Amino acid sequence: MELQGKKVLVFGSGKSGIGASDLLAKVGAFPVIYDGNAETDKDAVVHKTDGTYPVTVYAGELPKEVQDSLDLVVLSPGVPTDLPLVKSFYEQGLPVWGEVELAYRVGDGEVLAITGTNGKTTTTALLGKIMQDARESVFVVGNIGIPYTSKALEMKQNSVTVAEISSFQLETIDEFAPKVSAILNITEDHLNRHHTMEEYIRVKELITENQGTEDVCVLNYEDEVLREFGKHLTPRVVYFSSGRKLDEGIYLDGNKIILKDGEKEIEVVKTEDLKLLGKHNFENVMAAVAMAYYDGVSLDSIRKSICEFTAVAHRIEYVTEKKGVVYYNDSKGTNPDAAIKGIQAMNRPTLLIGGGYDKQSGYDEWIEAFDGKVRYLVLIGQTKEKIKEAAEKHGFHDIILCEDLKEAVKVCEEKAQPGDAVLLSPACASWGQFDNYEQRGDMFKEYVRNL
């Protein structure tokens, strides 16, 4: 679609919506911003744009004459596609894109795209480093803080875009076709948005929908859903595994990551040479290595990059050591499966801070994963009673309920002994007490440093 001269509704007035509006104006479209919250400060929204174009903001009610005059709708990732207003756009025959589709249509060059329930941020950052070390023009975008739309105009034919893509963003793609895609894993998450596990899986798998036979899809062999999915794909499928040797693909063999490509069997790296902790991180490394290798980056270059790479902020991030107690920030552990990875990476007795906003997750598997490592479970937020009940059902009773994160950190300091770890790995979203998981992690680090 030629965007110049088109009237486009941008649904959502947050960072993503503003980025989309600015980009649309730059390519000659006429953006209109809409927010479903009638209390939205419309002037404040206008001030958030780059100020180079006139824009009208609607809040609460969208006038029918505005809706009837539209050529295209761009949804922010936070807007569910099953809202009555969004459904009415589809019924009207309007194209409905997300920011990823918009950026893809405007930008040029090849795209390497990563999705999955957990590990996306680390894998994206790692692949970004590998590609930046190997290529001239590389953009790392997505949920990692840089909106795809903000860089789209800079993406030329020789550019490589490494994009972290969430399930929300995949709901609204149309022609988006990565040269190499990866689905790291699929576990229960965001059921408050996608309603069923089947729908969540369907949306995640959309990342491969427009890929051709020359393209590559990297999948986790240890994920049964993905192993089955890989049998029916158009692109070439490359598996990675942390649980077994593969005839083709990349796998963990003891302390070595091995790449098997046809007759070639190559040791990529020893795990002790990496600065990342835990089996889940070795899976992230394997996914990034496979994506870069099948995009033509040499193994020597890949090896150098992955050995230099350090952990992403808020993902089992070492904070400090005080009085023999090590503090880790895993605020990115926003669901039980991610938090399981956090506790599995601990190699000392642990005081675990959990709880937060309720995403309708179940906590049984997380509590089973404590595996004798957790000395105290210190709970905060909306879910604290629900998690306490689940823990007690599993026979775990060393539980302390706190009002907020500051109190939880103080309690951990009082209870911890030299040789222990204190781990913030909430298994829940941050909303309610914090704006986002980054703010929660930053506050944790500040409280720890002030002990």
Residue ranges and their predicted role:
Residues 24, 73, 114, 143, ...:
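Residue-level signal for inorganic ion chemistry
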Residues 155-243, 251-253, 258, 269-276, ...:
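Flexible active-site lid/hinge loop adjacent to a nucleotide/diphosphate
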Residues 1-98, 102:
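N-terminal leader/targeting and accessory segments in enzymes
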Residues 31-37, 217-221, 353-354, 373-382:
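Short internal beta-strands
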Residues 2-7, 17-27, 271-374:
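Nucleotide phosphate-binding/pyrophosphate-handling subdomain across enzymes
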Residues 60-61, 97-101, 234-252, 305-307, ...:
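Beta-strand->loop->alpha-helix junctions that form or flank phosphate-binding loops
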Residues 99-141:
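Walker A (P-loop) phosphate-binding motif
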Residues 45-51, 364-420:
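C-terminal helical cap/extension that packs against the catalytic core
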